[in-house]
Amino acid sequence: VNDPAVLVVGAGPAGLAAAHELAVAGVVPVVVVDREATAGGVPRHCVHTGFGLQDLHRSMTGPAYARHLAARAIGAGAVLRLSTTVAGVTPDGTATLVGPSGIEEVRPGVILLATGARERPRSARLVPGDRPAGVFTTGQLQQWVLADLPVGRRAVVVGAEHVAY
């Protein structure tokens, strides 16, 4: 697809949901690009249940929810281009994509940024020093648990988001 109607940057929950809704509404072609090799964003690393309660009215693990969202977007007609990065956008709206098929320029009608949540490193928050051994961010902990790596036996949880429980 050389010139999509919409180029969605980010294949996490928001990007996949937007692609689905746009395709269902007849806005085609919709192309979703993501630098990761697998669609789904942060939920891919969350093995706990609770995903899908609001929109699907059932509880799923994060990876299952991510697969569901990707399949739904594709089923509606969206095209997923994974392992693909937007290297730049010119003033006229031409986007340079770099991925497994090489370098490609596309001129979408609209670029929708859905780049999601990212944990900021300490330096970005102006906190000096290194993280002590055994201190995990939420994302790190979820990745270790998903990979079945040992994370310790005692924990102190700082925070109140739903993954803290």
Predicted ranges, named:
Residues V1-V9, R67-R154:
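FAD-binding core/adjacent interface of flavoenzyme oxidoreductases
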Residues P4-H68, R72, V151-Y165:
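Beta1-alpha1 glycine-rich phosphate/pyrophosphate-binding loop at the start
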